[in-house]
Every structure is written in structure tokens, then in C-alpha cells.
């Protein structure tokens, strides 16, 4: 299947990743471990829509926790991925507790997960996470188009019950 520009996603995303890694990550941001960064990018996509355990991600990639934090920062500053903080009434906990990870481009996340078609998505164990990523990013894009910046959070209790997105607006909440 092709996009409206006639470029198949299976052709577009590898080229996009190569350009991003070569130009932005290596040349502009100074990352030298390109092969490791590519593995990191794929393993980060495996965690889309999940509470992010940076230590686990680092261990799976064979890199230090500090390197993983640095590379997550690079994904954020280059608008590849972002973290959604947890909601707590205690503001300090919002900053210190674990965030969820999302990719701005759900198609890129799906590609990194090896999902190249609707049929593969339907059969994928990651379909729920990919769908959650899509919903969260589309809501964010909608607010940005309206030039609004509400505070967005996720919530999970000790029994692992969760709310994927909380939108805080002037003291009220939309779930």
C-alpha cells in the first residue's frame, strides 16, 4: 500500500530512519555508537504506550542507564518520541515517577515493531499499544492545532489499573 505521495511505507521508513540517524543523531548530536542507537530505537518502540523502565531498556540494549537517558532526551529533542508523566496530586511525584513512552509518528513506531500492514497490526501483540500511541498523539496534535497546551498525564494505581490519558484544564480533568 502506498501513501498519498506514492511512497510505500516499507520504502519510506528505512530511508527516514537512515537519514535521521546519519544526519541528526550522528552529525548534529554527536552520537558515535550508531549500531547501538538503532537497536535502542527499535527497543524503545517495543515500549510504546508502556510505563518506561529506563534501566530495563538500557540493559536490553547493552548500554549504560546514563546513555539510555541521554538517548531518550535525543528522541525527545528531535521529536521522535515523548514521555507522558504520571498524574499525582503531589506535583513532586509527577516529576519523579515513571513516565509512559510514545512516538510522535505511530507509523514509525509500527515500522520499528515490524508491522508493515493492517493485517500484521491486527495479529500483533503490540496492537493495543500502537492504538494507544495513535490516540494519545492525535489528541496532542489536535490541541496543538488549536494552539492549546493542556497538561497531559497518565495514571496507574498499585493494582495496575490505569487511565491512559488525563487532560488537566484549569483545575478540571477530562479522562
List PLM regions with ranges.
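Accessory nucleic acid-recognition modules appended to NTPase machines
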Residues: 4-173
Amino acid at each position: 500500500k502506498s501513501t498519498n505521495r506514492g511512497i510505500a511505507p516499507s520504502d519510506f521508513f528505512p530511508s527516514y530512519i537512515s537519514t535521521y540517524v546519519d544526519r541528526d543523531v550522528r552529525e548534529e548530536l554527536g552520537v558515535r555508537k550508531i549500531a547501538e542507537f538503532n537497536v535502542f530505537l527499535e527497543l524503545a518502540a517495543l515500549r510504546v504506550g508502556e510505563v518506561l523502565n529506563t534501566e530495563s531498556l538500557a540493559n536490553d540494549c547493552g548500554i549504560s542507564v546514563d546513555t539510555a537517558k541521554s538517548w531518550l532526551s535525543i528522541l525527545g529533542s528531535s521529536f521522535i518520541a515523548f514521555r507522558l508523566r504520571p498524574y499525582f496530586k503531589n506535583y513532586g511525584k509527577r516529576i519523579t515517577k515513571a513516565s509512559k513512552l510514545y512516538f510522535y509518528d505511530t507509523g514509525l513506531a509500527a515500522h520499528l515493531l515490524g508491522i508493515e500492514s493492517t493485517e500484521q497490526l491486527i495479529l500483533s501483540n503490540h496492537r493495543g499499544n500502537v492504538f494507544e500511541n495513535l490516540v494519545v498523539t492525535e489528541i496532542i496534535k489536535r490541541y496543538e492545532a488549536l494552539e492549546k497546551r493542556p497538561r497531559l498525564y497518565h495514571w496507574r494505581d498499585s493494582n495496575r489499573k490505569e487511565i491512559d490519558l488525563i487532560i488537566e484544564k484549569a483545575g478540571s480533568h477530562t479522562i
